[in-house]
């Protein structure tokens, strides 16, 4: 009798222990998938949120604070950004240019508007060849100047060696990247035809000097051409811009806001 009672108690304890172990194992197995599922959901949610931020940032197409599209300030401006095309001294589109949209600092754009108003009264509208220029484009110019490519030599630097352009015309930094420098000419308001200045944009040579008169490999700069260059220079100077003597098309805002800052956001 005592032996039977002992066996009965032993079997009862064994059954209880087995049941408890089974429940623990089942609980452990049900918890593991729940934890993994939660982690996966968090990871996916985080990844999706980052992608949305990137897409939204690109879609906004916004400019850094203090910069504007010139067209928004001067609606009748003609834009022909040469470095957004192959029609330039390199013969290829410059890095950083993705659209034909001139960009300037607010201060430069407002001063340019004042100049445009005076020129309009004289029968002209402004045409922009270049304005803000990304640093990536400037670096592209430097790489080009050190390469063997001379496909456009006859049209842009017929009397100069390509290597001599670096330092004199091309440098590792450009005032354009500060956002307050513009390369421009004028067109007749009624027809939109470009005024003949006696020499084209980005010609590397003496014929591009504002006061030059005489013959050069691509033609001749006459006294009338010089008068038009000087008229443009006088108007731009009156409205706060500073010219340079060797490029009749080049003007920088005297009181530019970013004298020591060079930007590298794309033109788009």
Please report, for each region that a protein language model flagged, where it lies by residue.
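Bacterial N-terminal signal peptides that target proteins for export
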Residues: 1-7
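Bacterial N-terminal signal peptides
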Residues: 8-17
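Extracytoplasmic cell-surface/polysaccharide-interacting catalytic and binding patches
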Residues: 20-131, 139, 143-246, 255-268
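Segments that shape or occlude catalytic/ligand-binding pockets
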Residues: 134
């Amino acid at each position: 009798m005592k032996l039977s009672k002992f066996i009965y108690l032993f079997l009862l304890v064994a059954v209880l222990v087995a049941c408890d172990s089974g429940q623990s194992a089942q609980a452990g197995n049900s918890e593991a998938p729940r934890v993994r599922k939660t982690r996966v959901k968090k990871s996916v949610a985080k990844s999706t949120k980052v992608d949305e931020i990137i897409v939204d940032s690109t879609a906004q197409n916004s400019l850094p604070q203090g910069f504007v599209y010139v067209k928004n300030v001067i609606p009748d401006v003609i834009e022909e950004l040469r470095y957004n095309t192959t029609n330039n001294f390199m013969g290829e589109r410059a890095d950083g240019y993705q659209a034909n949209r001139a960009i300037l600092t607010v201060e430069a754009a407002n001063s340019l508007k004042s100049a445009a108003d005076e020129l309009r009264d004289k029968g002209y509208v402004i045409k922009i060849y270049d304005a803000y220029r990304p640093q990536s484009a400037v670096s592209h110019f430097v790489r080009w100047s050190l390469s063997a490519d001379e496909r456009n030599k006859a049209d842009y630097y017929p009397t100069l060696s390509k290597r001599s352009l670096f330092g004199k015309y091309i440098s590792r930094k450009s005032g354009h990247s500060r956002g307050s420098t513009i390369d421009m000419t004028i067109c007749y308001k009624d027809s939109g035809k470009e005024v003949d200045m006696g020499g084209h944009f980005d010609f590397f040579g003496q014929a591009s000097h504002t006061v030059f008169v005489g013959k050069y490999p691509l033609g001749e700069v006459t006294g009338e051409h010089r008068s038009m260059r000087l008229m443009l220079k006088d108007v731009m100077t009156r409205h706060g811009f500073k010219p340079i003597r060797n490029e009749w098309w080049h003007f920088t805002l005297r009181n530019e806001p970013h004298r020591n800052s060079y930007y590298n956001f794309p033109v788009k």
